[in-house]
Amino acid sequence: QALARRVNSDLANGIGNLLSRTLTMIERNCSGSIPTVPTDYLDSEAARAKYPLLVHVKESLRTLEDCLDESYESLAFNNLLLHITSRVSDVDTFIDKHEPWKLAKDPDKRDELEIVLYTAAECLRILGLYVYPVMPSTAKNLAEQLGISLDFNSPLLRQKITWGSLPG
């Protein structure tokens, strides 16, 4: 039980730090509004080559669903929290690699900056849906901070996990 509390605390701190970091950059660079990016921004081979970590993060979040299903079925909540914590770390790595604070200084990199910030916010939205069953107040706070409305009681929750559903 002590391990579960520790993992839960680490996850809440990780999500909170990621949320704060993301929202601060959006506030500074996008007038506080989540940027809008084309839904097909990863469809070209060139885009996938330019953003390999984005592709990794997106795939990592997609596979999280299967990991969580196994954890819920076996009541292995520590594993569930560890899987989610790993994805939070992936998003942090993505941000660090793309250095949006540097992109913001170059007007020619505006599109790239918006893709990075949108991706971070979209990852947070999806992570919020995944943590809701074990950390409902964290998930609700995350949605509120992102300025989005989520119906956590919907039986169609998985349909909302589709990448690119974050309104910009």
Regions found by a protein language model. Give the residues of each.
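Long, charged, mostly alpha-helical binding arms that flank functional sites
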Residues: Q1-E112
